[in-house]
A protein has these predicted regions:
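Intrinsically disordered or compositionally simple regulatory linkers and C-terminal tails
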Residues: 1-20, 125
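Short alpha-helical transmembrane interface motifs in multi-pass membrane proteins
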Residues: 9-11, 36, 73
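Long, amphipathic alpha-helical coiled-coil segments characteristic
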Residues: 21-70, 77, 100-122
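Short alpha-helical "patches" and their helix-cap loops
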Residues: 89-91, 98, 102
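Two-component transmitter module helix at the DHp-CA junction of histidine kinases
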Residues: 92-95, 119, 123
Length: 125
């Protein structure tokens, strides 16, 4: 007789690394109609807003889903799709009442990568 192993408890897989650039410059150019000054303004606004929203999210967890939703829209607007995807995952889990420690970390990392890409882009403009 062989003993059957007990099935392991379900554990969520870590999020996959997004494919493509951190900042989709083609999308950004379409959204800003090719106007470099508008692009600069939008990128600077997103950089500030994303840092502020992340800080607020950590201090005000009850507002987390709304903050994540706001960040998701802003990120999509500039072509920071990894940030948008991370914010979407966080928003969904918060609305379901699920733990979000890993999702907050993924979002913070995505924002950090986007900030670096924005800094690089602003220097190139």
């Amino acid at each position: 007789m062989s003993a059957l192993a007990k099935p392991a408890d379900w554990v969520d897989s870590p999020p996959l690394a997004p494919e493509g650039p951190v900042l989709d410059l083609d999308h950004l150019e379409r959204m800003t109609l090719g106007e470099r000054e508008l692009e600069r303004e939008v990128l600077m606004l997103f950089a500030q807003q994303s840092a502020d929203l992340l800080a607020r999210l950590e201090k005000l967890p009850r507002e987390g889903a709304s903050l994540a939703h706001t960040l998701k829209g802003s990120a999509r607007g500039i072509g920071a799709f990894a940030v948008a995807d991370a914010a979407d995952d966080l928003e969904r889990r918060l609305r379901q009442g699920l733990p979000v420690t890993a999702e907050v970390a993924v979002l913070a990392q995505a924002i950090g990568s986007a900030q670096a890409a924005i800094d690089e882009r602003l220097q190139a403009l």
